[in-house]
Amino acid sequence: MDISRTEQRILHLMAQGGRIEISRDDDRKIENVSCFTRDGWLYPGVDLDLFRRLKRLKAIKSSGGQPYRITERGLTLVRSQLDNR
């Protein structure tokens, strides 16, 4: 399955240890999505639509109220890239 360039970029970041945190409003609806690198830096470019697409693809998942992490399916979707470290 092909995924877009932005989805690929976020999944690669999450495969290296990144996470997605959400904040909810008073009605328990998701109002804000933030993506953090493994070093704790806020990564721009993740919006609610991209978050929903990744969730629909079952590439990310949250368990026990923890931040969203990449799943095994997400790891198979992401194409390998060279790490700059």
Curated annotation (Swiss-Prot):
This is UPF0386 protein RHECIAT_CH0001945. NCBIfam families: PRK13687.1. Belongs to the UPF0386 family. Transmembrane segments: none annotated. It comes from the Bacteria. InterPro entries: YjhX_toxin. Pfam families: YjhX_toxin.
